[in-house]
Amino acid sequence: MKTLVVALGGNALLQRGEALTAENQYRNIASAVPALARLARSYRLAIVHGNGPQVGLLALQNLAWKEVEPYPLDVLVAESQGMIGYMLAQSLSAQPQMPPVTTVRTRIEVSPDDPAFLQPEKFIGPVYQPEEQEALEAAYGWQMKRDGKYLRRVVASPQPRKILDSEAIELLLKEGHVVICSGGGGVPVTDDGAGSEAVIDKDLAAALLAEQINADGLVILTDADAVYENWGMPQQRAIRHATPDELAPFAKADGSMGPKVTAVSGYVRSRGKPAWIGALSRIEETLAGEAGTCISL
C-alpha cells in the first residue's frame, strides 16, 4: 500500500469569516472526513492541518487572563495540535471501516537565525476590520497586515528544517494507522531544545514530512480546485499537469498559492515522486488526473 501525505486547507476546519466555535469546526470537519476516509482505505495516510485561526484565538484567550504570564507561541501551537487533532480523530474514527486513527504532537526544528523572524508574514487568528488596526497594535503589540478585505495578526514563519518525530509517524503508518501530525506546521523548536515564537507554514511542513518518510505522493488541498493561469481573468485556465520548473512563476504569486507551489515543487525535485494541488471535494478525481494540478518531473 502506498503512503500519501495530505495537507488540509483551512476551509476543512473553518470558512473565512466564521466564528471560531467548536460547533462550526465540527460541522466543517464532518463535511471533510468522508473523502479522507475513502482515501484511508486505499493508502497509508498522514494528515497535516493548519491552525492559523485557532492558534490566534488561543493567543487572545491567553492574553485575557492578566494574572498569569502569557504562554509562548510554541506552547499555543502544541495546544492547537491537541484540539484540532482530537476533533479530526473523533470524526474520522466515526467513519465506517476506518483503520485506527492516531494523533502525534509533532516538533519541527527551525533555525533561530531564519530571516523570517525579522519580517513576520504568517497570518494567525480571527479577522478584523481595517479600522481596528491602530487599537489592536497598541493594545497587544501585534503586527497587523491586510488579508484580502480584512485585517489579521502576522507572526514569524521560519523554514522547517527537520521533523523530530518522523520515526514515530513512519512506524504508526507501517502499522496501519491513519496519522494526524505536523498540525499547524508543527511546534517550532531550535536545535538546543528551546521552543520558538513562530508558526510554520503547514504546506512546507507537509512537504518536509513527505520527504523524510519517503512518501509516495503529496497532496495539498485548497479552496481553489487547481493552479490557474491568468487567475481571476476571463481567460483563466486550470493547469492539469506541470513540472516544478513550469510552475516556478507561481511560487512568487501573492496570496496562499505561492507557498503551496513552493512546497510541492521542493518535494517533487527532492524525491522524484508526484504531488497534487486541488480541492478536498475532488480529491479522488485529482489523484486520477481528472481535476486539480499534478506536479511531476
From Swiss-Prot:
CDD domains: AAK_CK (cd04235)
Annotated EC: 2.7.2.2
InterPro entries: AceGlu_kinase-like_sf, Asp/Glu/Uridylate_kinase, Carb_kinase
Keywords annotated in UniProt: ATP-binding, Cytoplasm, Kinase, Nucleotide-binding, Transferase
Localization of this protein: Cytoplasm
Catalytic activity: hydrogencarbonate + NH4(+) + ATP = carbamoyl phosphate + ADP + H2O + H(+); carbamate + ATP = carbamoyl phosphate + ADP; hydrogencarbonate + NH4(+) = carbamate + H2O + H(+)
Membrane-crossing residue ranges in chain numbering: none
GO biological process terms on file: arginine deiminase pathway
GO MF annotation terms: ATP binding; carbamate kinase activity
Pathway involvement of the protein, from the record: Nitrogen metabolism; (S)-allantoin degradation
GO CC annotation terms, alphabetical: cytosol
Top EC class of this enzyme: transferase
Signal peptide: none
Protein family per UniProt: Belongs to the carbamate kinase family.
Role this protein plays: Kinase involved in the anaerobic nitrogen utilization via the assimilation of allantoin. Catalyzes the transfer of a phosphate group from carbamoyl phosphate to ADP to produce ATP and leave carbamate, which spontaneously hydrolyzes to ammonia and hydrogencarbonate.
UniProt xrefs under NCBIfam families: arcC (TIGR00746), PRK09411.1 (NF006926), PRK12354.1 (NF009008)
Protein name: Carbamate kinase
Species in which this protein is naturally found: Escherichia coli O157:H7
